[in-house]
Amino acid sequence: MKEFFKDALKLPYKPNNEVREHENQIEDLLKKHGLKYKPQPNGPQQSPDFHVNHNGKVISLECKSSKDPKPIYNGGLPKKGVVYIFSSKKYNETTLYFAEDVVSDKKRELYDEYLMETNQILKKYQALDEWKNDDRGFHFYNRSMYTQKGNAEKTDYFKHENRKRCEQRVLNYKW
């Protein structure tokens, strides 16, 4: 696995558009290294992109690609235990990290608390007659949207002070 990840770090930027170029180059690397894997184990719109079977373990890989130096997560917070392989057009480079290296457990707890509180507020309003008796069927739901903001020191995955530490954690993990 270590050699696979070393090669992944050498990959140039590829978009993950309809053709899934970034995922395809990762799949080519998996084949090159003779690794057994299953693509899209949870379906094409769910994480991870690959399950790799190695030394009796299943390793989850998620491919991210962006023209910017930070990935877009949309409604899905980076999943713990998953290795992210992120390619950026801005630098024409790839980096690696574990989800838990970019989102702390404490931050995850805060997000969970926030979502529970906002869902309780929504349920309170949904119980009102005015809400239930809408003759046009309008409804509302809360949608999580995880973004990153701040200066490049915080959000640029390629210039971040912990980039090398994150990559080394992936490379040196006991696969």
Which role does the model predict for each range below?
Residues 1-48, 52-56, 65-175:
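Nucleic-acid endonuclease domains
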